[in-house]
Swiss-Prot record:
It comes from the Eukaryota. It comes from Homo sapiens. PANTHER family: LUNG ADENOMA SUSCEPTIBILITY PROTEIN 2. GO terms for biological process: negative regulation of cell population proliferation. This is Lung adenoma susceptibility protein 2. Residues 255-265 have a biased composition (Polar residues). It is found in: Secreted. The lineage of its organism: Eukaryota, Metazoa, Chordata, Craniata, Vertebrata. Residues 1-31 form the signal peptide. Keywords: Phosphoprotein, Secreted, Signal. Residues 248-268 are annotated as: Disordered. The modification Phosphoserine is found at residue 161.
Length: 372
């Protein structure tokens, strides 16, 4: 694995690799070999990743076969920057009690100029091998996530909770209220009467600019109008529900017709009225006023009686008058015969119906008498 510079290195408190190394012991020597060498089970490895891979293989075999065991990894390398990493970054729980203030200030000033982006920080296998067996790490570094000029590049340090509790000369971070109610975190310490941290002004300025840009991009209508789901919108009048309906006055049917059609309609109406009001209307096949069967029989009987009276009156008259009136009587008889033809037919039908009614009445009377 390629060795990256120690200025971009960071350690996590819980690491799977450090947990794996908890069962082994590491020992280092201060040799001046720049290439470095790693000894594991009487074998020499040029990189720490190779030695660690061999150790992992033996560890897996030990899980399968109880007879297999892991050995020790001996580190024979020392870098100048690595010593700074071990002396300043990794500290026990009492790190700030035995702190060399000059080295600590030099380390922080060095880190201010070198660290640019927190995403670029990583640990190599060599750094992982130098960590303690329990994987503890009490110092965490937080750097700015943006780039500015060299004068504005600043480093922020944040201490663990355990170190704050044990160090009586340490003042924890406090927040100061700036303009626009922005919280400005500040880290201060009384080491040699100097401040170790300062305000994060650049981050606040960047946040302000982002907020201003977001508010400027919002449309004006969204600023003026409320949300459509608010109570005001729900309780307001809904124009789309109150659709105005126009009622037209009734128009007569014949208003748009031509004068010829109106005249025809009037003439037809007059004909119908005349036909209904005409009492002397002759009987036709399509009808007229039809009476009931009893009324028809009555009219037929009255007609027969009138004919008989006329016939009797004609017999009682004098013979002279009869001779004189022969021509007139013949003519009247002919007219009577012609007028009696439909009457006789209707009388025959009426007599037939009467006979049937009489039979029905007799039958019903005959059925009732035995029951009595």
């Amino acid at each position: 694995m390629a060795k990256s510079k120690t200025k971009h290195r960071l350690c996590s408190q819980e690491s799977s690799v450090s947990a794996l190394l908890a069962s082994c012991t590491l020992s280092g020597s201060n040799s001046s070999n720049s290439d470095g060498s790693f000894h594991y089970k009487d074998k020499l490895y040029r990189s720490a990743s190779q030695a660690l891979q061999a150790y992992i293989d033996d560890f897996d075999l030990g899980q399968i076969y109880p007879g297999a065991s892991t050995g020790k990894i001996n580190i024979d390398e020392d870098f100048t920057n690595m010593s700074q990493f071990c002396n300043y970054i990794y500290k026990p729980n009492n790190a700030f009690e035995n702190l060399d203030h000059k080295k600590h200030s030099n380390f922080i000033s060095c880190r201010r100029h070198t660290v640019n982006d927190i995403d670029s920080m990583s640990l190599t296998t060599d750094d992982l091998l130098r960590l303690p067996a329990d994987g503890s790490f009490s110092y965490t570094y937080v750097g700015p996530s943006h780039r500015t000029s060299k004068k504005n590049k600043k480093c922020r340090g944040r201490l663990g909770s355990l170190d704050i509790e044990k160090n009586p000369h340490f003042q924890g971070p406090y927040t100061s209220m700036g303009k626009d109610n922005f919280v400005t975190p500040v880290i201060r310490s009384n080491i040699n009467g100097k401040q170790c941290g300062d305000k994060i002004e650049l981050l606040i300025l960047k946040a302000k600019r982002n907020l201003e840009q977001c508010t400027e991009e919002l449309p004006k209508s969204m600023k003026k109008d409320d949300s459509p789901c608010s109570l005001d919108k729900l309780e307001a009048d809904r124009s789309w529900e109150n659709i105005p309906v126009t009622f037209k006055s009734p128009v007569p049917v014949n208003s748009d017709d031509s004068p010829q059609q109106t005249s025809r309609a009037k003439s037809a109406k007059g004909v119908l009225e005349d036909f209904l009001n005409n009492d002397n209307q002759s009987c036709t096949l399509s009808g007229g006023k039809h009476h009931g069967p009893v009324e028809a029989l009555k009219q037929m009987l009255f007609n027969l009686q009138a004919v008989q009276e006329r016939f009797n009156q004609n017999k009682t008259t004098d013979p002279k008058e009869e001779i004189k009136q022969v021509s007139e009587d013949d003519f009247s008889k002919l007219q009577l015969k012609e007028s009696m033809i439909p009457i006789t037919r209707s009388l025959q039908k009426a007599l037939h119906h009467l006979s049937r009614l009489r039979d029905l009445v007799d039958d019903t009377n005959g059925e009732r008498s035995p029951k009595m």
